Amino acid sequence: MAREKQIIECVPNFSEGRNKDVIKQITDEVESVKGVKLLDVDPGEATNRTVVTFVGEPSVVVEAAFRCVKKAAQLIDMRQHHGAHPRMGATDVCPLIPVAGITLEECAVLARQLAERIANELQVPCYCYEAAAKTPERKNLAICRKGEYEGLPQRMTEAAEAPDYGARDWDEQLARTGCTAVGARDFLIATNFNLNTTSTRRANAIAFDVREKGRPMREGGSPIGKPMKDEKGEVIMQPGTLKATKAIGWFIDEYGIAQVSMNITDINITPLHVAFDEVCRCAQNRGIRVTGTEIVGLIPKRTLLEAGTYFLKKQQRSTGIPEEDIIKIAIMSMGLDDLKPFNPREKVIEYLLEDTDKTPKLIDLTVKEFANETSRESPAPGGGTISAYMGALGAALGTMVANLSSHKAGWDARWEEFSNWAEKGQAIQAELMVLVDEDTEAFNRIMSAFGLPKGTDEEKAARSQAIQEATLFATEVPLHTMKASYKVFELCRAMAEEGNPNSVSDAGVGVLAARAAVLGAGLNVKINASGLKDKETAARLVAEANELIEKANEAEAEIMKIVEAKL
C-alpha cells in the first residue's frame, strides 16, 4: 500500500515582535524552501515576540527551520531585547509537531538532529525539550529556559546546566544570539463548543466538569463551600473527565452566546469527537445543549476522518466511503458550520498543502479530459497509467457492492462485515489512484534522463546511470500496480459470494477490470525491464509479473463462474 505522506508542523518563536522588516526577512527564509507552506505569522507588540507556523514534509520543514533560525541569529541582538514573555534566545523555541504519517518519536529524532545542526553550524547552543528531551527534567520547557536570557552566562559555567548541544563559553556572539530550545510535541487543537445559553457561569461549570484539572473540592459538596486543602495547604482538585484538556467558559459578544473554550493538548488521548460528545453529555446534565463547534486555527485531516468514522459507526453505517463524505459527516455531526461556513480546504493542513502544490495531476481531470489527454499525440499517459486507473475502478466497483450490502434492508446485523470490506476497497482504490500519476511520472523520468548532456565522459556516465535508475523505477511502478490490482480479486470474490445479489454483475465487472489492470501493467513491466542492463534484476521482475498474471487469470476465471451462476 502507498505510504501515507509524512507531514510535520514547525512553530518557532522569535524574539522580535515590533520590527516588521526583521520579521519579514525571517519568514522569507521559510518561504524560500520549496514544498513548505507558511501558514501564519503572529507578531506581539507587548511580548516583542513573533510566532511563525509552517508545514510540509519533514526534510523541507527541518531545512526551513534551520534557515529561519540562522536568519534570526543574524538579525536579532538579544542584548537589546525586552518583552513581556519569557525568552532565552533570538529563536526562543522551535518545536516540531507530527501532523500526518509520522510519530511523535520520529519528530523527536528530527528535533535532536536539528538542534545538533544549529549548534554545530551556527554556534547557537540548544536545549532539547518535551518529547525530544534527553533527560526527564528537561521535558519541561521552563526547566530548559530557567533564568531566561539573563541567566545564561552563569548557566554556561555549570556542567549540570550545559545545553544538550553546543556547550561553550559565554562570549560576544553568544550574547547576541542566546540559546534555543528545540523540541517535539503533540498537535494542539484549540476549539470552542457553542452553547444555547448566555450564562458564563454555566459554561464554566461544564468546562470544570470536563477539563483534566477539574475543579476545587469544596466543603459539604456545595459550590459555595470553602475549597478543601491537603496537609500541605494546597487546594484539593476533583479531576475532570477528559485527559489532556484545558477548558474555561466564556461569553462571546460577537455571537451572543456562551462557549466552552478548550485546548486539547494530545489528540491521541482525547480526540476532538470524544471531547465533543463529553461536553454534550455534561451540558445536557445541566439542561444545556451544545449547538455546534468552532475550530480555532488549523487541524490535521485525521481529526475529521476519525470523527466522521466515529459518528458513522454510531449510526451503524458503512465507513468505507470516500474521504470527502466522511468529513461531511464530521462537519454535520459536530456542527462545525454552526456559526459560520466551515470549508475543509481552508481548515485542514493537508488540503492547504495540496492546494499549494500546483503540479497538474491526471486524477484531477474530468473523465472526458482524462480520455482526451490519453488520446493525444504524446506517449504519456499510456498503458501503465490506464492499467492503474482500471484497477482503481475495479476496486471502486467492489467497494460499491460492499456499501450497498452494508445498508441492505434485512441485513442490518451484517453492516459491519460489509463496512470492513468497503474500507479495504477504499484503501486499494486510493493506492491505485496514486499510481495513476506515478506511472506517468515514471515515464517522464526516463525522458528527462535521456535529455541529460553527454558531451564528456563524466556526463555520459551520469546520463547512463540516470537512465538505468529511471528505467528501474518505471519497471517497479507497474509491478506495484499489478500487486495492488490483484488485491481487488479478494474483495470482488467476497462480494460475488456474500454481497447483495442484485449487484453481482457489478462485482463481475470489477473482476474484469482488475484482470485487465494486472495484465496491462504486466506488459509495461516487460517492456521497461527490457531496457535494464542488470539482466538478473530484469529477469526477477519479469518472473514476478508473470506469476501475478497467471494468478490473475485463475482468479478471474473462478470468480466469474460464481458471478455467472447468480445471474
PLM feature spans:
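Amphipathic alpha-helical interface segments
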Residues: 187-189, 439-512, 516, 528
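Amphipathic alpha-helix face/heptad-repeat signature
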Residues: 389-393, 421, 428-435, 474-484, ...
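A structural-propensity feature for long, helix-poor, extended segments
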Residues: 407-453, 548-557
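Long, contiguous binding/interaction regions
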Residues: 2-369, 376-377, 454, 459-462, ...
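Preference for long, well-ordered alpha-helical segments
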Residues: 114, 124-128, 137-140, 488, ...
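Polytopic transmembrane helical bundles with strong interfacial aromatic enrichment
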Residues: 357-366, 372, 480, 484-487, ...
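Conserved phosphate/anionic-ligand binding catalytic regions in large, soluble enzymes, centered on
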Residues: 10-12, 16, 88-95, 266, ...
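Amphipathic, well-ordered alpha-helical segments in soluble domains
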Residues: 68, 370, 396-400, 442, ...
